[in-house]
Curated annotation (Swiss-Prot):
Biochemical pathway: Protein modification; protein glycosylation
Name assigned to this protein: N-acetyllactosaminide alpha-1,3-galactosyltransferase
Cystine connections: none
Locations listed in the record: Golgi apparatus, Golgi stack membrane
Gene Ontology MF annotations: glycosyltransferase activity; metal ion binding; N-acetyllactosaminide 3-alpha-galactosyltransferase activity
UniProt keyword DNA repair present: no
Listed Gene3D superfamilies: Spore Coat Polysaccharide Biosynthesis Protein SpsA, Chain A
GO biological process: carbohydrate metabolic process; lipid glycosylation; protein glycosylation
Purpose of the protein: Synthesizes the galactose-alpha(1,3)-galactose group by catalyzing the transfer of a galactose residue, with an alpha-1,3 linkage, on terminal lactosaminide (Gal-beta-1,4-GlcNAc-R) disaccharide borne by a glycoprotein or a glycolipid. Preferentially glycosylates proteins, can synthesize galactose-alpha(1,3)-galactose on glycoproteins but cannot synthesize the glycolipid called isogloboside 3 (iGb3).
Binding site for Mn(2+): 228, 230
Parts forming coiled coils: none
GO cellular component, one term: Golgi cisterna
Record note on domains: The conserved DXD motif is involved in cofactor binding. The manganese ion interacts with the beta-phosphate group of UDP and may also have a role in catalysis.
UniProt gene name: GGTA1
Length: 371
């Protein structure tokens, strides 16, 4: 074969490889896995400093790499459309669970198994082509003890059938477990600064989540959940949980009177809630909503945390105390029953039909730097 023929053949081979690769990464079998070392995302900048590399899983996710601009445009158009949520009467029937509280005094639904029609909701949100984000933090020994099981279970049960982005915050990227992703799923991993005290790790996540929402998350997802890593999904956590602002009932306190709640009772704290006030006790292990609402939650909670630091006081249950104060003043539009975050140490209540997420064993002596 002459030189010209070899050149033509080489060009054909290269073109074929490029076409095959392009088709692969734009198929459900192509998976991309982002890692970012930027500790502080540049607010207002769409360009994230970092890098991505392909991670070829058997059941990978659709590639978002070439779609980010299109997704951003689609999100903006969706905002302009100003589509509302599906009317409550179309998917929610509080009378199906008369033995528990299913409607708050401000008319927000409390979602229990049996009260919702997931098929109707899945069909509604599928037409909107929603993307749901999930943030999770794993610092220090929490990575080895909890992160892999959390991600594997979330991959199986979180928002099945809908596009999902997992935002994983770790202090050591080299210890990040590689997980086989299901269809429509992708990871974005960010390296964050570790704190000396576990209390500060817990409270600083509010600041970090807010920064990432402003920098990029608000352009990438329609709804966002923030969850603790020391829990595991056991059943479908689906679109019945989506709402403008979503709070989780704390399993140990869902039947208690507000005066029994472990609210912050010291007036000096920004999280102070006096006796005689309060609706429910909310668990900081799960909260969510639209990016705008979650941004407001995290900013207001962090503002309270900073105010407490200036006054040399720390709320009794740290970020959770501030979250409860926030939801007292800004009522959640949807509340999740304890089925969505159950502790088996309580035993099995007749109220709990299906456990969606379960607490993991709290091995604080092994995972926390200071007790």
């Amino acid at each position: 074969m002459n030189v010209k023929g070899r050149v033509v053949l080489s060009m054909l081979l290269v073109s074929t490889v490029m076409v095959v690769f392009w088709e692969y990464i734009n198929s459900p079998e192509g998976s991309l896995f982002w890692i970012y070392q930027s500790k502080n995302p540049e607010v207002g900048s769409s360009a994230q400093r970092g890098w991505w590399f392909p991670s070829w899983f058997n059941n990978g996710t659709h590639s978002y790499h070439e779609e980010e601009d299109a997704i951003g445009n689609e999100k903006e158009q969706r905002k302009e459309d100003n589509r509302g949520e599906l009317p409550l009467v179309d998917w929610f029937n509080p009378e199906k669970r008369p033995e528990v509280v299913t409607i708050t005094r401000w008319k927000a639904p409390v979602v229990w198994e049996g009260t919702y029609n997931r098929a109707v909701l899945d069909n509604y949100y599928a037409k909107q082509k929603i993307t749901v984000g999930l943030t999770v933090f794993a610092v220090g020994r929490y990575i080895e003890h909890y992160l892999e099981e959390f991600l594997i279970s979330a991959n199986t049960y979180f928002m099945v059938g809908h596009k999902v982005i997992f935002y994983i915050m770790v202090d050591d990227i080299s210890r990040m477990p590689l997980i086989e992703l299901g269809p429509l799923r992708s990871f974005k991993v960010f390296e964050i600064k570790s704190e000396k005290r576990w209390q500060d790790i817990s409270m600083m996540r509010m600041k970090t989540i807010g920064e990432h929402i402003l920098a990029h998350i608000q352009h990438e997802v329609d709804f966002l959940f923030c969850m603790d890593v020391d829990q595991v999904f056991q059943n479908n956590f689906g679109v019945e949980t989506l709402g403008q602002s979503v709070a989780q009932l704390q399993a140990w306190w869902y039947k208690a009177h507000p005066d029994e709640f472990t609210y912050e009772r010291r007036k000096e704290s920004a999280a102070y809630i006096p006796f005689g006030q309060g609706d429910f006790y909310y668990h900081a292990a799960i909260f969510g909503g639209t990016p705008t609402q979650v941004l407001n939650i995290t900013q207001e909670c962090f503002k309270g945390i900073l105010q407490d630091k200036e006054n040399d006081i720390e709320a009794e249950w740290h970020d959770e105390s501030h979250l409860n104060k926030y939801f007292l003043l800004n009522k959640p539009t949807k509340i999740l029953s304890p089925e969505y975050c159950w502790d088996y140490h309580i035993g099995m209540s007749v109220d709990i039909r299906i456990v969606k997420i379960a607490w993991q064993k709290k091995e604080y002596n092994l995972v926390r730097n200071n007790i």
